[in-house]
C-alpha cells in the first residue's frame, strides 16, 4: 500500500470518527473527563484537560452531519475504485 494523499485523508477521517463517537457518560466520565469537571475561574487560562474536553465537545457538535457525508463519499469511492 502506497503512502498517498487519499491515505492521509482517510486517516484524518478515522481520527475524527474516533473523537466523534466518544460518549461522555459511558467513557469520558469513567476516566475523570466528564462534563461536571470544573474549568477554572474567570481570567484563568484553561488547562490542557479543559481544552481537550472543549475540542471533543466541539467536534461532536459541529462535525456530526459533515462526517455522515464524508463517510458516505469514502464508502462510495472504496466501492467504485477498490
Swiss-Prot record:
The entry's localization annotation reads:
Endoplasmic reticulum membrane
Q: Does the keyword Metal-binding apply?
A: no
Q: Matching Pfam families, A to Z?
A: Yos1 (PF08571)
> Which GO BP annotation is one of this protein's?
protein transport
Q: In its keyword annotation, does this UniProt entry include Transmembrane helix?
A: yes
For membrane topology, the record states: Multi-pass membrane protein
Q: Name one GO cellular component term.
A: COPII-coated ER to Golgi transport vesicle
Q: Where are the transmembrane segments?
A: 2-22, 62-82
Q: Which UniProt keywords apply?
A: Endoplasmic reticulum, Membrane, Protein transport, Transmembrane, Transmembrane helix, Transport
Coarsely, its chief localization is: endoplasmic reticulum
Q: Which PANTHER family match?
A: IMMEDIATE EARLY RESPONSE 3-INTERACTING PROTEIN 1
- Record-stated family: Belongs to the YOS1 family.
Tell me, in a sentence or two, what this protein's role is: Regulator of endoplasmic reticulum secretion that acts as a key determinant of brain size. Required for secretion of extracellular matrix proteins. Required for correct brain development by depositing sufficient extracellular matrix proteins for tissue integrity and the proliferation of neural progenitors. Acts as a regulator of the unfolded protein response (UPR).
Name of the protein this chain belongs to: Immediate early response 3-interacting protein 1
- Lineage, broadest ranks: Eukaryota, Metazoa, Chordata, Craniata, Vertebrata
Name of encoding gene: ier3ip1
